[in-house]
Amino acid sequence: MTLRFYDTATAEVRDFAPLVEGKASLYYCGATVQSEPHIGHLRSALVFDQLTRWLQFRGFQTTVVRNVTDIDDKILAKAAEAGEEWWARAYKYEQQFNAAYDKLGITRPDYEPRATGNISEMHSLIQDLIDRGHAYPAPDGSGDVYFDVRSWGKYGSLTHQNIDDMQAAADADPRGKKDARDFALWKGRKPEEPTTASWPSPWGAGRPGWHLECSAMVGKYLGDAFDIHGGGLDLRFPHHENEMAQSQAAGRPFANFWMHNGLVAYQGEKMSKSIGNVIGPGELFAQASPRVVRYYLGQAHYRSVLDYSPESLEEAAAALARIDGFLVNAGANVQRVEVEDSGHMYLPPAAKQGFGWFAYAPLSDTPAAFVEAMDDDLNVPKALAVLHETVRAGNSAIASSDLVELQKKFEAVLAMLDVLGLSSIATDQAADNGSTHALETLVQTRLQERQQARTEKNWARSDEIRDELAEAGIKIEDSSNGATWSIERKQQR
């Protein structure tokens, strides 16, 4: 099946044809580091991590850029309110964002430029727009420079709006505009703002406008044209509309695809700081492991609204428990499979490293139905259905002692988990190789002792060992191929 994505600009699902064969260039909007991250930021980053992983799986060499907006009206206002330096506040929250991303196993981008590190590129873009008649310095001497929206006939094409129906640009204290919808490319310094938050320019000391920052950084790292621009649905207008307008007005084709992820709701209600229902990473990770959180954030179609509730994390944990239970039982059985062609025992790489085989994922074993789902506008819900159906089939293979079929299902599940980024994070059962290897050694010793008791028909001793392990949270399951074990998951409240 051809790889296809929904393009916001054309409002249709289109075949993905990269600008350069075999390569895919992506830019997605990172954080404005004014305060701590929340669940919406995490979902957006995760969606584009899934996209990047899938493009790589399909053989594309990816170049990913995610910006950091480290200078902005809100950053200045909140820093002043808190009595701290704006740059210190920005850096502090940038680190918090990265820590949350890392915890979720979100791959770092190839480039992560800060707005403050690309001022000269912004000056060049502004001057180009002025020279082309699409921007103008404010006539009041304020140092502001604005984009002239009526000079660009395609303004509104991304969000399919008529210019006269649009809201006024929400620039703080706008000065000297021709049209209320004109937006700031450069903001002249105001007397109450710190001198450290301004840079010299041909139009006077000041700082860049938010929309301009992204266009300049895209041009620097990906060139005038690139494959995919991504971000949250709330960024379509005005941010992405303005990005596209100013870039194309400067003669840059810009993005070939625009992809937007849906927002996160709280039990059906829009999340809002004023309501007090915004969920941060600290609260999420207190309720569930990073792997469970990743499963939850990534399980819905990326364009749909994701609804949050404590129960949704419990459901995600239960879904992963079913997968992990299969892997534990299958791992013990798969090691017994003799590979017919080679005549030696099949053993997954690192299988002797406790749960090391969670990281084993031969991509060639990914089921065709899974590939078709992911190719179809990154349909993760459908792909997860394939994953869970494979788990069910694998459990049936265990029950029927069909070890050859079990091996196939085992490899397929590992492959799908790897693609979804669910095998790259330490599992709840395996925080690190050292501790899990020790745990497995201890449990296996007890199981051997139990098996000896069963051989001697000492059923009381066998049950006693089983009960002792159960008390420690170890669940034992007996089958014709021997006993297997897993950690009994407790519901997190």
Swiss-Prot record:
Signal peptide residues on this chain, from the entry's feature table: none
Subcellular location: Cytoplasm
Entry annotated with the keyword ATP-binding: yes
Biological processes per GO annotation: cysteinyl-tRNA aminoacylation
Database matches in NCBIfam families: cysS
Motif 'KMSKS' region positions after renumbering to this chain: 270-274
Source organism of the structure: Renibacterium salmoninarum (strain ATCC 33209 / DSM 20767 / JCM 11484 / NBRC 15589 / NCIMB 2235)
Subunit and interaction comment: Monomer.
GO molecular function, a single term: cysteine-tRNA ligase activity
Catalytic activity annotation: tRNA(Cys) + L-cysteine + ATP = L-cysteinyl-tRNA(Cys) + AMP + diphosphate
Cysteine disulfide partners in this protein: none
Protein name: Cysteine--tRNA ligase
Binding site residues for Zn(2+): 29, 214, 239, 243
Chain ranges for the short sequence motif 'HIGH' region as given in the UniProt record: 31-41
Keyword Membrane carried by entry: no
